[in-house]
């Protein structure tokens, strides 16, 4: 018993037999915890249980928790690959007691597991306890038979754990193994404790106090246990190796890397193999948990992890996307323990492939600019923070890649200036935002809920109801009345108005009383159960404690219901057409249209959209009832209902089922309906009430996220009618029947492209002065012994200039070519080419930047042998070429 999967199973089975609930790993994205970027410990999903804010059906639990440490203060990224045990992704095995057993049972369970189940030799083990924890020391003596020299008292924070400045806390006891004198290092607490000989592998936290303020701790009424064992460390111990990367799981991944790059590992390159193996795990699990690469927050950390691995793949000689080829090996090794990995396999592979393709473009472009900006820097110098920030902000070149690229030359980066530039950008963004003023009322909601209670929502059953006004607010403050002409916020004890949530917009309508009429322009939901009606009083005065009639705009609500039900049908249809990796990333359900964001790494083809539309409309034609029922959340998910990523559900949830399986097969395991989702929104009564579904747009909203926009009911029919009229008009212009219009238009477009190619070729020949001679107006001189050929060409854009420069370079054999093309709009493009024998002396990027200013442009980019720039000032063409010549003279 030493394989990673077997060790994990043994741990969980052992604690299950000891009366613990085996709880699945929570997502790497913590729910409702803004203090954490990623889940980084087993106790994270139980934080509210430990504090008493949440109750579970069990008081003992055990988990194998996915963890990532690559952002914020818990950041191991830079060390990964270069040490034996640093990882961005790791698994933490743990057992937990919520007020059930305490120190004696925790120590007994741990000791039995490691000595009996795992077979570790007792004489190789030792422990630490907190300096004042005599109880734990005594228990180790009693249970393990340890002598005093095997129980090391530590008085530092390493052996006292706190959740925060206040809250549950308590002493720790860490279990170590002595790996023998062949390794360097001393026992914990000694001056050389950081060596590898004594390895800590399990931490037992005894939560027995509540920290109230500095220096004040009270005993907890129900002391608890939180333990954490690194699976990778335990695997290394049981497999008799001294590096986590030599365990069976990592050997399989490293072998896959070697196969992908066609290169066997060597000591000099082993760090790169380790980086790729580790980062593959982090990247894949983060994507499976809904994180996609981006430019901020979690997405940016994921992008850094991915691109660090991709750069190491390039170091190993990979010239094509490589990471995605490793995903099947990872799924084979870890998919059984984490089924979400199997479900998301295609999304993970597509995301890695797309990101690596983008990264190669970024790397080439960024390195070219970085080379030009750092050309004059010497060893010990620093690249300016502003330049590094421009590379990051404009070109997507991460700071750590800039640092890595300059490291070999001994050049640093002014990271303080980089951070300052980043802060200025954030501040500018904050100042650009203009709030609605409602933020001033946020602190009010907590007090109101305590005083007047939650709002009872009646909107699932009715669109009209009676209620009592429980609170009125105006300009962020509580008031007792709202008079005619005034706007404000109204709370009632019960309401049929739906408060905006889950992507569905809030209801509008009327609040009425004798002599009073207030128009509800929006309804929001605060703290999950306080419904806030935004009103404008049109007649009379609305008063506190006043009985009122609440009437939802039922025409608008009907359209919203249809659109919300349509999102469910589209969600399932998209999964059927595109694959199980599709997950909802956001939505907007309004009366006019619906917007639906999904995880998918590439544009959705027109034929795929047509299939999605056909499947969804087939369910509409069934006119099947839309059934909603309340269920326990675990029972709902077990029955096949889909839970949306990132949503937090209570113990009881609403399950919305609609339609029959299309083509005779259930789309969801164990589900007898086409779509079954957890949802708190309002829905159509039958699928036929949706009328029709028409997809009107598909676009990208970020890396790996696509947006679908659609219409339903009358809006869908009107859209189709307008499309038909437009198509008929186009057919009339083309003088063809509607059925032949696409072919006729295709033929016209092909003719146009052919004529454009012929025109471009004619212009190129005219610019070159015919097949055999130099272009008219071209001038050739020698500068510093190097041939320099320059010309200005009217009527050519940038894409036409590059072939001309390439041709001129061939004619010259050795030399430099600079050509300015002036378009019909007066804008100009400058292309500079340097023959291969001169690129060591001259850089086309530097030369093109010298001339860009005369054209009214800034910068320029490319490679040492070919670069381009542009600007609005075609009149400066000759001045631009003069500037290039001057730069050549100075370089000579």
Swiss-Prot record:
Cofactor requirements of the protein: Zn(2+)
One GO CC annotation: cytosol
Reaction catalysed by this enzyme: tRNA(Ala) + L-alanine + ATP = L-alanyl-tRNA(Ala) + AMP + diphosphate
InterPro entries associated with the record: aa-tRNA-synth_II/BPL/LPL, Ala-tRNA-lgiase_IIc, Ala-tRNA-ligase_IIc_anticod-bd, Ala-tRNA-synth_IIc_core, Ala-tRNA-synth_IIc_N, Ala-tRNA_ligase, Ala_tRNA_ligase_euk/bac, DHHA1_dom
Entry coiled-coil feature ranges: none
GO biological process: alanyl-tRNA aminoacylation; negative regulation of DNA-templated transcription
Co-factor: note: Binds 1 zinc ion per subunit.
Pfam families xref list: DHHA1 (PF02272), tRNA-synt_2c (PF01411), tRNA_SAD (PF07973)
Class of enzymatic activity (EC top level): ligase
Signal peptide: none
Main location: cytoplasm
This enzyme's EC code(s): 6.1.1.7
GO molecular function annotation: alanine-tRNA ligase activity; aminoacyl-tRNA deacylase activity; ATP binding; tRNA binding; zinc ion binding
Residues bound to Zn(2+): 564, 568, 679, 683
Superkingdom field: Bacteria
Keywords: Aminoacyl-tRNA synthetase, ATP-binding, Cytoplasm, Ligase, Metal-binding, Nucleotide-binding, Protein biosynthesis, RNA-binding, tRNA-binding, Zinc
Localization of this protein: Cytoplasm
UniProt xrefs under PANTHER family: ALANINE--TRNA LIGASE, CYTOPLASMIC (PTHR11777:SF9), ALANYL-TRNA SYNTHETASE (PTHR11777)
Family: Belongs to the class-II aminoacyl-tRNA synthetase family.
Protein function: Catalyzes the attachment of alanine to tRNA(Ala) in a two-step reaction: alanine is first activated by ATP to form Ala-AMP and then transferred to the acceptor end of tRNA(Ala). Also edits incorrectly charged Ser-tRNA(Ala) and Gly-tRNA(Ala) via its editing domain.
Domain notes: Consists of three domains; the N-terminal catalytic domain, the editing domain and the C-terminal C-Ala domain. The editing domain removes incorrectly charged amino acids, while the C-Ala domain, along with tRNA(Ala), serves as a bridge to cooperatively bring together the editing and aminoacylation centers thus stimulating deacylation of misacylated tRNAs.
Listed name of the protein: Alanine--tRNA ligase
Organism of this sequence: Methylobacterium radiotolerans (strain ATCC 27329 / DSM 1819 / JCM 2831 / NBRC 15690 / NCIMB 10815 / 0-1)
């Amino acid at each position: 018993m030493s394989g990673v999967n077997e060790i994990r199973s043994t741990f969980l089975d052992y604690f299950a037999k000891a009366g613990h609930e085996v709880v699945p790993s929570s997502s790497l994205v913590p729910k409702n915890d803004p203090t954490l970027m990623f889940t980084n410990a087993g106790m994270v999903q139980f934080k509210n249980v430990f504090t008493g804010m949440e109750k579970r059906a069990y008081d003992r639990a055990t988990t194998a928790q996915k963890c990532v440490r690559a952002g914020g203060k818990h950041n191991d990224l830079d060390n990964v690959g270069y040490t034996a045990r640093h990882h961005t992704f790791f698994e933490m095995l743990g057992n937990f007691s919520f007020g059930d057993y305490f120190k004696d049972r925790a120590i007994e369970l741990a000791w039995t597991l490691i000595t009996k189940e795992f077979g570790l030799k007792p004489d190789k083990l030792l422990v630490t306890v907190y300096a004042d924890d005599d109880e734990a020391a005594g228990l180790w003596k009693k249970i393990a038979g340890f002598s005093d020299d095997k129980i090391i008292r530590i008085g530092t924070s390493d052996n006292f754990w706190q959740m925060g400045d206040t809250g549950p806390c308590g002493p720790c006891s860490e279990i170590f193994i002595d790996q023998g004198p062949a390794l360097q290092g001393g026992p914990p607490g000694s001056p050389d404790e950081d060596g590898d000989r004594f390895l800590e592998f399990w931490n037992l936290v005894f939560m027995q106090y509540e920290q109230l303020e500095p220096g004040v701790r009270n005993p907890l009424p129900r002391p608890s246990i939180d333990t954490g064992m690194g699976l990778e460390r335990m695997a290394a111990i049981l497999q008799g190796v001294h590096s986590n990367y030599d365990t069976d799981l990592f050997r399989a991944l490293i072998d896959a890397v070697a196969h992908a790059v066609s290169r066997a590992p060597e000591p000099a390159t082993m760090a790169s193999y380790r980086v790729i193996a580790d980062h593959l795990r982090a990247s894949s699990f983060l994507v499976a948990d809904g994180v996609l690469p981006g430019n901020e927050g979690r997405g940016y950390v994921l992008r850094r992890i991915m691109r660090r691995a991709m750069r190491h793949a390039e170091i190993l000689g990979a010239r094509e996307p490589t990471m995605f080829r490793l995903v099947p090996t990872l799924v084979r090794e870890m998919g059984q323990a984490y089924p979400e990995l199997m479900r998301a396999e295609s999304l993970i592979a597509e995301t890695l492939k797309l990101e690596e393709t983008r990264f190669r473009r970024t790397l080439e472009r960024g390195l070219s600019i970085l080379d030009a900006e750092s050309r004059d820097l010497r060893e010990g110098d620093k690249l300016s923070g502003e330049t590094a920030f421009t590379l990051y902000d404009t070109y997507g070149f991460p700071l750590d890649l800039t640092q890595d690229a300059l490291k070999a030359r001994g050049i640093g980066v002014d990271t303080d200036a980089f951070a300052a530039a980043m802060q200025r950008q954030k501040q500018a963004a904050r100042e650009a935002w203009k709030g609605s003023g409602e933020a001033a009322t946020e602190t009010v909601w907590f007090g109101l809920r305590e005083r007047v209670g939650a709002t009872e929502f009646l909107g699932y059953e009715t669109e009209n109801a009676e209620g009592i006004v429980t609170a009125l607010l105006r300009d962020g403050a509580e008031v007792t009345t709202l008079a005619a002409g005034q706007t404000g916020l109204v709370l009632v004890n019960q309401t049929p108005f739906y408060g905006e949530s889950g992507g569905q917009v809030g209801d509008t309508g009327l609040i009425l009383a004798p002599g009073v009429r207030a128009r509800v322009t929006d309804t929001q939901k605060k703290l999950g159960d306080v419904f806030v009606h935004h009103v404008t009083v049109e007649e009379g005065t609305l008063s506190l404690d006043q009985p009122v009639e609440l009437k939802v705009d039922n025409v608008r609500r009907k359209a919203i219901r249809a659109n919300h039900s349509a999102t469910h049908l589209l969600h399932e249809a998209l999964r059927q057409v595109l694959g199980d990796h599709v997950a909802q990333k956001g939505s907007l359900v309004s009366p006019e249209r619906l917007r639906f964001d999904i995880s998918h790494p590439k544009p959705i083809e027109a034929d795929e959209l047509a299939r999605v539309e056909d499947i969804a409309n087939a369910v509409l034609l069934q006119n099947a009832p839309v059934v909603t029922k309340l269920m326990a959340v675990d029972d709902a998910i077990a029955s096949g209902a889909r839970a949306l990523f990132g949503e937090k559900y209570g113990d009881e949830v609403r399950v919305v089922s609609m339609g029959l399986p299309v083509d005779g097969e259930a789309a969801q395991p164990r589900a007898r309906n086409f779509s079954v989702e957890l949802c708190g929104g309002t829905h159509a009564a039958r699928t036929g009430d949706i009328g029709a579904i028409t997809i009107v747009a598909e676009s990208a909203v970020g890396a790996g996220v696509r947006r679908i926009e659609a219409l339903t009911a009358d809006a869908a029919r009107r859209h189709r009618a307008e499309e038909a009229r437009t198509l008929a008009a186009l057919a009339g212009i083309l003088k063809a029947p509607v059925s032949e219009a696409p072919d006729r238009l295709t033929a016209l477009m092909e003719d146009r492209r052919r004529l454009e190619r012929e025109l471009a070729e004619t212009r190129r020949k005219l610019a070159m002065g015919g097949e055999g001679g130099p272009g008219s107006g071209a001038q050739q001189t020698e500068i510093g012994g190097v041939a320099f050929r320059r010309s200005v060409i009217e009527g050519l854009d940038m894409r036409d200039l590059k072939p001309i420069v390439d041709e001129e370079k061939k004619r010259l054999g050795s030399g430099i070519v600079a050509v300015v093309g002036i378009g019909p709009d007066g804008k100009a493009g400058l292309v500079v080419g340097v023959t291969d024998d001169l690129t060591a002396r001259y850089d086309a990027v530097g030369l093109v930047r010298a001339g860009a200013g005369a054209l009214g442009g800034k910068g320029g980019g490319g490679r040492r042998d070919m670069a381009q720039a542009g600007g609005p000032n075609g009149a400066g063409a000759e001045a631009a070429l003069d500037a290039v010549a001057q730069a050549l003279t100075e370089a000579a």
